[in-house]
Each structure stands twice: as C-alpha cells, then as structure tokens.
Amino acid sequence: MDFYQTSLSQLHDDLVNKKISATELTKETFDHIKGNEDQVKAFISLNEDQALKRAAEIDAKGISADQLTAGVPLAVKDNILTKGLTTTAASKMLENFNPVYDATVVEKLNAADYINVGKTNLDEFAMGSSTENSAFFTTHNPWDLTRVPGGSSGGSAAAVAAGDVLGALGTDTGGSIRMPASFNGVVGMKPTYGRVSRWGIIAFGSSFDQVGWLTQNVKDNALLTALISGNDERDMTSSLKEVPDWAAQLNENTNVKGLRIAVPKEYFDGLDEDVQEVIKAALDHLESLGAIVDEVSLPHTKYGVPAYYILASSEASSNLQRYDGIRYGFRAADVKNLEDVYVRSRSEGFGEEVKRRIMLGTFSLSAGFYDAYFNKAAKVRRLIAQDFEDVFKDHDVIVGATGASTAFKIGAEIDDPQTMYMNDVLTVPVNMAGLPAMSIPAGFSAKNGMPVGLQIIGKAFDEQTVYNTGYVFEQTTDFHKKTPKLGGQN
C-alpha cells in the first residue's frame, strides 16, 4: 500500500468500518517500504515484528470512532527515544543504544494505539541539512535519487514522499522539518517552541529543538500535531496553553479573505530564479483569493545564520558532553587510561560535522571569547525576535520561500560547510524567535522539476492561522497531489 491517495480520516474510517484490518494495513505498508527502501534508504531500522504484533492486538480489541491513529502505521525520527527499539541519532556513538523509556510524544502515540513501522534516518545528532551526515548511509530524494532529501529530518520526509507512511515525526532545530518538507514536496510543521514536549528527544540545541510532523497534507498535520501537543511536567519549557482543535477549523468555509500577509524583502535575497518564480506565483494566488500582501523588512535576517550556529553549537557542545565512553554509548577499544577513554571514544564515536560543531561551541563559550561571540549572538537573537514582533503588529502571517534552492545533488555541498549552513538562512530565524512555521508544496522548479516549498510563519501559539493559510492554498491548488515516479530523475 502507498498513502498517496488517502488521508488520516479516510484511513481511520476504513479501519473502524473493517474495510481493512490493522494487520492487513501494516503488512501492506511493509511491502511498500521494502519495494523502494533499497533506492530511498529512508529508515535506519524497521520494526516489522513488533508492528505486526501490535496490529494484531489492536485488531483483537477493536478500533473505536474516537481513536484517530489506532492501527495507523507511522514513522519516528531516530533521535526520538523508543523503548525497546534502538535509537541511534544516526551516530556511531549510539549505534547500539536501546532506550529504557519512551519520549513523551511516543507515549502519547502509544496511548493512541499507533503502529511504529520504524526509525528514520537523519544527519548525525540532527546536525546537518542534507542527511549526508548520517553515520550509516545517505537517504535519497524520491523525486530524484541523485539528490539529497534535505536535513536533518531527511529520512522522515523521504518516507512520506515515497508513500511509505501518512506521517513521520521529525525534529526542527533550525529548519530540520521545513527544509526536507520543501525538498520532498510534503507538508512539514514546526510548532511554537514549548507547544510539544522535548522529553525523550536526544538534545542538540535545547532552546531551539521542537518536535513536529511531516505529512502528505495540511489537515493530517494538524490532527497529528494536536495529538502530541500539550504540557509535560518533565519538560520545564513545555507550555501550559490549551491545545486547540486546529483541524476542526479546516473545512470548505476556511478562507484567506482579508488575511494580512507580510512578505519580507530579505527573503528574496539570493533565491534561485526558479524558486523565486514559484514563490511569486504562490503569493499572487493567495492575493487572488482575497489576501492582502505587503512587502515588509526583517532587517536582521542576514545575521541569523552566524548567530544561530554560535548559539546552537554552544548548546550542542554542552549537551554532547555526556557521551564520554563511560556511562553508555560507544567506547573505544584497547584504551590505556581514563584520558584515552574520553579522547578516543569521542574522536572515533562522533562524525566530522558533530566534532566541528562541538569545537565551535566550546570555543564560543570559552573564557575570553564568550562576550565576543556567544553574548553577541544572544543579542542578535533578541533583535530577530523583535523584528518578527514588529511585523506581526500589523500582519497575520509572514510568507516566503522555505529554501533558497531546490534539493541539490548528493555530494555537491558536503565538503563546503559554509555553503551548507547558508541553506538555513530562511528557516533559522523562526527557531531563534520560537515561532510556528510550516512548509507546504508550492510548485515545481522550471529548471529541474524538483519541488519548491512555501514557508508560512505565524505568531507564537497561533498555529491555527498558519494551518488555515496552508489549507486554503493546498485546497485551491493541486501541488500536494503530485507524487514522485520513484527512481526517475527529473
């Protein structure tokens, strides 16, 4: 089975009405995954035996009308803890790590009787924009197997784009849900910071990380995001705000008439011409539906990437200190003393990009450089947040391209970290400000036929307006209905 021609609600109805059983659906899902996994390589591990066992249990007790995800196969990014199922963060350091507890988001999914088909590939410790930094293998873009799927949630995006699953969990620290969504022509939502618990997420940048979904369509995304949202006393940064029923507002009456859309002029700087054409057409379409489109300025956008990489790398250097070769994780062989354990375990266990960011972060936090780098970057973060606040005084959403280009060729940028980092120029400011943002399919490049994503940014905790805008665009276009001819190159 592939999930291109269905939705979560339709699938739920079929399961409730016994048009298909959870066991049949799960078997068909694995058949589909196995049919293209050799090409796409979206999964680090598959969970077939446990998934089929779980499906049989769900069939035995039955599925009620209020259990939306019961019996539904979904995927989980491999930096999200799953009890009894290896969680590697795509790193040699955690290659054999078997968690003893579930992340909060997984607990919620288990309570809703979902079926976990497997753990998806990512850049090691979620550090990267192409999924080429995985310690195990590179995931391929289903639209063109010679191109990257984006990162760090590239495996999750590729699994959804390939029709393996209706939805896959990802994490977004600086664009790691939205950029893969754009590259793969799917929907990817980063909720407001604090909307979803981070408990059980392998930490990269704790003040940036947020969990979200990659899905085939906007309404499924809204339904699944609501399921994992809400306060968690184990995560002191999780919000006490009530979680709205976003999907209930997505219907034939939803419109964008009078919606005030801000388009930052800085978001067109450096855009590839083919991307620019798609984004301008998308804005024209929204305007034709009654939205009011204004050009605005977010003047500190250009400082976002350097500030982000200082701050996020500083947090990463602190978070990754725990991997020392002593308590758990990879430990180097034939070590001579304690210092040897530390040095060799970390040198051999971490990949090049992770070590690069640890070094950058440690330098930024060191005596004599803290004020010049970390402190200054923190000030830039506040200025970026203020830019957004100023624009949102007179506008409902901010809209622009998700990325400056379409998916690039595998190997094209992996040896050029600075170019790779600049891919995040349009996404990292959102994480700096903790705002909700979603990438939706907006069209295809006239140059190479690859998908282009439209990024919709909302006010803090106003996911509803983001979903409304994306839903109206989606329902009045057909870009989300286009699917890759797997194996074909555009």
UniProtKB/Swiss-Prot annotation:
PROSITE patterns: AMIDASES (PS00571). It is an enzyme of class 6 (ligase). This is Glutamyl-tRNA(Gln) amidotransferase subunit A. Disulfide bonds: none annotated. GO terms for biological process: translation. It comes from Limosilactobacillus reuteri (strain DSM 20016) (Lactobacillus reuteri). Heterotrimer of A, B and C subunits. The active site is at 77 (charge relay system), 152 (charge relay system), 176 (acyl-ester intermediate).
